[in-house]
Amino acid sequence: MGIKRALWWMVVCVVVLQVSAQHWSHGLNPGGKRAVMQESAEEIPRSSGYLCDYVAVSPGNKPFRLKDLLTPVAGREIEE
C-alpha cells in the first residue's frame, strides 16, 4: 500500500511539474512561434543613425574636445 501511494504521488508531482513548466509569456504562442513578436517588431520605427553628432565621435577624441571647450573658459578666468 505504501509503495502504491508513493508511486501515485510521484506521478502527480511529475504531471504538475510538466503542466506548470509550459508557460507562454510575452506573447509567445505554443510551439515557440513568435508571430506576435515579429508583428510588434515591424511596427517599431528604425533609426538611421545617431541623433547627436557628438555621440558619433570616437572615444579617443572626446578628451581633446573637452579640452578645447574648457580652454576659452580658463582663459577668461585668467584675464578677469
From Swiss-Prot:
Keyword Secreted assigned: yes
Compartmental location: Secreted
Name of the coding gene: gnrh1
One Gene Ontology term, aspect cellular component: extracellular space
Keyword Signal appears in the UniProt entry: yes
GO MF, one annotated term: hormone activity
InterPro entries associated with the record: GnRH
Entry keyword set: Amidation, Cleavage on pair of basic residues, Hormone, Pyrrolidone carboxylic acid, Secreted, Signal
Signal sequence coordinates: 1-21
Entry protein name: Progonadoliberin-1
Pyrrolidone carboxylic acid: residues bearing it: Q22
Modified-residue entries (Glycine amide), positions: G31
Function: Stimulates the secretion of gonadotropins.
Membership in a protein family: Belongs to the GnRH family.
Database matches in Pfam families: GnRH (PF00446)
Domain of life: Eukaryota
PROSITE patterns: GNRH
